[in-house]
């Protein structure tokens, strides 16, 4: 009998082996079929069906059977039809991931197919070309009967609309992620509810375009619901969520919801996390509702309009770990019911940007798990409780802009993990407690605008993590500790407006080159730019920690009302260095510092802003400062400096300099940017001369001591002069000879003899009425037409107001970061465009006028000409030629504007024209002009479809920090900003080249630079193209171009190479715009298009207003990374 049972068992084992082997063979066969169906064969190179399923790339096996397969991130470029016919059929696979694998096609291709019986988790996320309706999703879930987790986030679900019926739907799913798709209609969501989506435990519909919340039925099993980032408006309908009593997480943030706190939520007694932030809710919080939500661990109501006091029932929630009520209008005191439980788990308390009063209650000290405490921008008074030192886990203590008094408690030294101590804008007194030296993790110390005194402690130099030190606007005295140079992480040092004396320690530069990568990471900040010329405040501006605060609410700061903060910029304190890391901001102004400026400060390779003004500094300006290659702002005004301005400063790309009120002498260097600044920046230096100051008088009397040496030099000088005159004569003869051979250019493209524009050294007659008259006045508008080639008629303010119908919205044809643009027809019939600039309260009349005179002289066929400008009070208006077809963005992405498509010939002409205009700014103007915001909306199209670059001078109208601190505003537009701008405040011509590369991609692909529908939330056009260039490269081109003329494919590829070169991550490897033009010319030279087209294209390149390609190749010196 035993032998019989043994024989039967052996038969079963053998049968199992046979079945397993057959199943494995079936899996291998399906994988081989899939491999053959994948267009990108290189992605699965090295495997064939004979290798077995377990050796397939991304395979996971258990006991010899294929149980999981992950091809996430592999650029398959496969059709979903092939996936459904092969990978979904794998019999033993439990987990299948094709996340970000470039799968495309329709989800409906799975219709009729059956999934493998073991499949439990399917991840198809991040495939932007995978499209279908929510009904297709339900059908896929039904086809895979055992499926529990389905992830389709970042695809194109919703692009197709649902039909009728409901089907078995989603009932079997445990988790469904449809976030970041295209679900728009309310009917889609209602269909899903009818199809049983309420039975799904985890449902993520964030980042779609849903506009309403239907009533969820049969949703007792729903535990997680995320509808954030949609377009839901109005109040949450009563009863919409009342059946979902099992909900543990509800996220309705970033919508347009309004009304009072939704009453239904009080019935969701199982809630662990509730997020209603970034909506328009208002009214008081119902205390009785929160009394029922005893399981809440996270509550976020920030960025709403809730008011009244904070209910005790909120503060005393027993399980609460995170409480964020920031940016509302709560009033009253901080509840004393906080952390009543000695075992409180609260680790985040955000109450900033409200109207809270009273003191900091002792109850806060009971929150022993607290990691982050932010009470900034309130009206909290009293002293900082010494008991806060009991919060041993605290990392962030942020109390700026309150009414706190008294001394900084020494007990804070017990918080040895403290990283951010931010107490600006209070009334604190005393000195910095020496005990704080124990807080060795401090990263950001900000004590500005208090009444602190005493010396700056030398022990600060021992804080190896210290990155930001702000002690400005206090009464600190004594010398600057040389030990600060030992702070190897220090990037921001602001000591302005104190009573410091002694010399500037050369040791401050010791940390240069010793910094690590990623020193300060992740803290939101706002930088308030201060216009010192008309302000009661001092220094270049104020850096504030800015977590969960509305920018508009900064107007409540008394200091902002006193100071003339011209602009504010929001960003994140994340800074990395490629090499030679150093300080980036140094402000020691308004002190009593004396002695010479140490030349070692020039060793700070990344230093961008240096303000040493309003001190007692003496000696000469060290030429070594010019070794700080990234220096953008330099203020040495109101000192006792003498000697000349170093010629080495000509190599700096300065955007702001102030050397006024010193004892400097000599000539202002003409090279570089120094001569482009207004004379106010050099005034009150009795020995200084040269533009923009009066010219140097070389015949002025000399002292007797100098007479003999000058006599000895006379012979040599006369010889040099004769040589120079002869050389000048030869140059003139050559120029005349060349000029006689060149055909006349159009009048509007008149050039200087050497094709180079130099800033004006003289001022033509102008119309000097200052435009301060009211509308009823008869005085002429102050329009400066110096060197403008086609003077406008005499215009009054009333003329422009009448031409734009009072700047009526109906006349507005555009809007951007610099202001609104209006179409206007003047009385003589001429149609112009009038740009009404945003108010620039920090821009003086002289600076504005000088800049306008410079911009007005720049004429080129591919630049939009400035016809005139005017100013009245704070108003600034610019008058331009009107461009009939608007911008390239309008023409390319909104074709109804001109009612026609752009074929490749037109796009090529636009690409070359825009490049020519930008090359002219970079290489034909001295100093060169950096556009700073090159994008398709700044490429205008005239009636001949000729590209004209606009706004090329706008960034210079703003102050340096406008163009060097805010990559999110003036220094670029999302999608066009080069990667280095996120690490450096400094704009360069190579940044413009990158932005031009994006414009060229737009012309080639027909796609905008950013579109989450096409590229996903974390991608853009550049990233999308770079992904596709690894696959079938021609897929990136606009299908309309190849459909119209397949023969242009090779030419498109050549232009794509140019675009990719412009988009190199390393600026030094990008071509100059002159090189780009040369590459265009090479393409034309080798083009196989017909002679007529070729001739036209060649003309479009060579006929630049000033012969950009014919000029000697004066390649700009490469910027060092």
From Swiss-Prot:
Reported impact of residue 491 to M: In d61-2; mild dwarf phenotype. Fertile plants. Insensitivity to brassinolide
Role description: Receptor kinase involved brassinosteroid (BR) signal transduction. Regulates, in response to BR binding, a signaling cascade involved in plant development, promotion of cell elongation and flowering. Activates BR signaling by targeting and phosphorylating BSK3, a positive regulator of BR signaling. Forms at the plasma membrane a receptor complex with BAK1 which is activated in response to brassinolide. Phosphorylates BAK1. Phosphorylates REM4.1, which reduces REM4.1 binding affinity to BAK1 and allows the formation and subsequent activation of the BRI1-BAK1 receptor complex.
Stretches that traverse the bilayer: 719-739
Span list, region Disordered: 693-712
Residues annotated as glycosylated: 102, 151, 218, 251, 275, 280, 307, 366, 381, 473, 501, 564, 580, 658, 665, 684
Gene behind this protein: BRI1
Disruption phenotype annotation: Dwarf plants due to the lack of internode elongation. Insensitivity to brassinolide.
Binding site residues for ATP: 813-821, 835, 881-883, 887-890, 933-938, 951
CDD domains the record matches: STKc_IRAK
Record comment regarding domains: Contains two pairs of conservatively spaced Cys (Cys pair 1 and 2) possibly involved in forming some heterodimers.
Source superkingdom: Eukaryota
Pfam families, per the entry: Island, LRR_1, LRR_8, Pkinase
Protein name, entry field: Brassinosteroid LRR receptor kinase BRI1
